[in-house]
């Protein structure tokens, strides 16, 4: 075991595990095993209305059935309100966040006007200087101006990435108007708290990475290495998800789905990885992953 490597898979319990989720789980599991590291599972269940009762337990059971069991007990984000509150208070004390009273309609109108003027579509910072008589609805993190707003990072799959937070995003939400914690704060805090060193996830989250890196800097926590795998799309070119009708995985025979997931990750042509047993598949798949992303040798 390599104590210097800690990775994770972080599903949302909005339904059963489907093929798109399996690709993300397999990629993160293979990277952890190729590095001799620790693989964790975090249940991202902050969005109460979308959370399906029993889905988290079903996902964990399906992962185990497919041969992927976390090395430490799973963590549920819904139990971590006090920790997120402490992180926000740290940012408040540092003067890095501010309350925002803008409604969704006001923000949409502002972005529509900016589009018509062919200017930036980022949040315009309406409440940066005060609420102007409006009640506080959310908390936003200030992003810097000028060259300090540009966050550049090297992705292990997608190569060098860069985003100007000031012009492409604007001050972004850490706590929503409905009282829910925003994805960016919860993910950054949980990764740091768990000592995550390597994040392997779908490329649909590539756009969030610059924000997360900037927030890590604000909180004074380490930045992990990132690898964003291509997402699975349906016949219409949309990301395969529960919302687009993705079906649950076949529980009785995991190998065909695993082989297809490995093929999607470019590890082998469909069917080339050995069948027969999960152990044989995972040995071959881990070796194939290590040849591309290292460092299993030795």
From Swiss-Prot:
Its cofactor is Zn(2+). A motif ('HIGH' region) lies at residues 11-21. L-glutamate binds at residues 8-12, 44, 183, 201. Gene3D superfamilies: HUPs (3.40.50.620). Its EC number is 6.1.1.-. It holds the Pfam family tRNA-synt_1c. Keywords: Aminoacyl-tRNA synthetase, ATP-binding, Ligase, Metal-binding, Nucleotide-binding, Zinc. Binds 1 zinc ion per subunit. One of its GO terms (cellular component) is cytosol. It comes from the Bacteria. One of its GO terms (molecular function) is zinc ion binding. One of its GO terms (biological process) is glutamyl-tRNA aminoacylation. ATP binds at residue 242. Zn(2+) binds at residues 100, 102, 123, 127. A motif ('KMSKS' region) lies at residues 239-243. InterPro entries: Glu-Q_tRNA(Asp)_Synthase, Glu/Gln-tRNA-synth, Glu/Gln-tRNA-synth_Ib_cat-dom, GluQ/Sye, Rossmann-like_a/b/a_fold. Belongs to the class-I aminoacyl-tRNA synthetase family. GluQ subfamily. NCBIfam families: PRK05710.1-2, PRK05710.1-3, PRK05710.1-4, queuosine_YadB. Catalyzes the tRNA-independent activation of glutamate in presence of ATP and the subsequent transfer of glutamate onto a tRNA(Asp). Glutamate is transferred on the 2-amino-5-(4,5-dihydroxy-2-cyclopenten-1-yl) moiety of the queuosine in the wobble position of the QUC anticodon. This is Glutamyl-Q tRNA(Asp) synthetase. It comes from Burkholderia orbicola (strain MC0-3).
């Amino acid at each position: 075991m390599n104590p210097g490597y800690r990775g994770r898979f972080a599903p949302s319990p909005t339904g059963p595990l489907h093929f798109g989720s399996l690709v993300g789980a397999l990629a993160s599991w293979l990277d952890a095993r190729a590095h001799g590291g620790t693989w964790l599972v975090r249940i991202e269940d902050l969005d109460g209305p979308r959370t399906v009762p029993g889905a988290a337990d079903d996902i964990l059971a399906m992962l185990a059935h497919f041969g992927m069991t976390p090395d430490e007990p799973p963590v549920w984000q819904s139990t971590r309100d006090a920790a997120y509150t402490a992180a926000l208070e740290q940012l408040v004390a540092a003067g890095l966040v501010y309350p925002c009273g803008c409604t969704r309609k006001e923000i949409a109108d502002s972005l529509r006007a900016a589009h018509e003027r062919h200017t930036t579509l980022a949040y315009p910072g309406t409440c940066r200087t005060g609420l102007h008589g409006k009640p506080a609805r959310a908390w936003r993190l200030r992003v810097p101006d000028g060259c300090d707003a540009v966050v550049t990072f090297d992705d292990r799959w997608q190569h060098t990435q860069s985003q100007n937070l000031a012009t492409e995003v604007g001050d972004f939400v850490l706590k929503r108007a409905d009282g829910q914690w925003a994805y960016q704060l919860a993910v950054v805090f949980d990764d740091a708290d768990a000592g995550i060193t390597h994040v392997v996830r779908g490329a649909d989250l590539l756009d969030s990475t610059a924000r997360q890196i900037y927030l890590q800097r604000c909180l004074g926590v380490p930045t992990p290495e990132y690898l964003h795998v291509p997402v699975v799309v349906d016949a219409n070119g949309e990301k395969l998800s529960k919302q687009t009708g993705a079906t649950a995985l076949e529980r009785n025979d995991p190998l065909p789905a695993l082989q297809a997931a490995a093929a999607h990750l470019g590890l082998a042509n469909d069917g080339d990885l050995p069948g027969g047993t999960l152990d044989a598949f995972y040995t071959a798949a881990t070796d194939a992953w290590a040849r591309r992303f290292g460092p299993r040798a030795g």
